[in-house]
Amino acid sequence: MDYTNNGPLKVVYGDYTFGVHGSGFDYIFSYAQGGLESIVKDGCEWLYRCPKPTFWRALTDNDRGSGFHLKSGMWMAADMFMKCKNIQVAVDGVDQGFPCAPQNNRYGGDVYAYEAKISFVYETITVPSTEVKVDYIIEKSGRMKVEVHYFGKEGLPQLPVFGMRFLMPSVAEKYIYEGLSGETYPDRKAGASQGIFVIDDLSLTPYLVPQECEMRMDTKWVEITRVKQGLHTLRIEANDSAFAFSCLPYTAEEIENATHHEELPLPRRTVFCIYGAVRGVGGIDSWGSDVEDAYHISAEKDIKFSFVIA
């Protein structure tokens, strides 16, 4: 099938997948995995695992000193394990319900649309539990808006971060972004300058103990480049407001498990996390002082953010 840049989307109702295809892009959503299973842009696959909500960043020396991990440690478990409890599909604004087999048999032949939307609702394993809703909205141009909504719940401890984690198949060659210079956090960005910056080394900051690092605040867009039979680039843009992100070769859990840098595995993936909320890192001292109240993230309040995969 030949598509034009502004032509209709081809929608495929699989038994256990929902596909949206167009000129130079393919998106596949897995009902079994509970998320976006594949992003292919110009023949390059960008996903190794389904993106999921993320609640945890690796601890810092200041976190350990203040005992933050003892108060909020359940968010690390929530970051690793969650239940996808609901999936809904809408095409051109018409609710299609959950069209897995055998309900998908009602769609015969090629199906085309101008917009497709699929929503996933995740339940956390925290006590008490709460929910996160993620909406993927694909436009006919191939741009995909991602809307993320965390539902606050009374009784939950403070969050380290809240965002979405994308695990990519190989280590990125570099990334370019427009935002604040250097490593920045909500309470550590006063000296940063706005600009466009190129980062061609995804290594961790060489602290004595591997820990949280390389956050980039107030970002308007980021382009990640990787090699697969040539250079390929994936662009993520802010939607309503700027976002924070990190782009590292390790998950927070891998960093957490290492007490020395030589204990980290060889880099083999890109872990790209985009955040709607980030806790400060403190630094008043490392033996008990908490982050200032203004830089806490309440888990009892709703958090919403959105971005665009261009």
Which ranges hold each PLM region?
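Beta-strand/loop-rich accessory regions of lumenal/periplasmic or secreted enzymes
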Residues: D2-A310
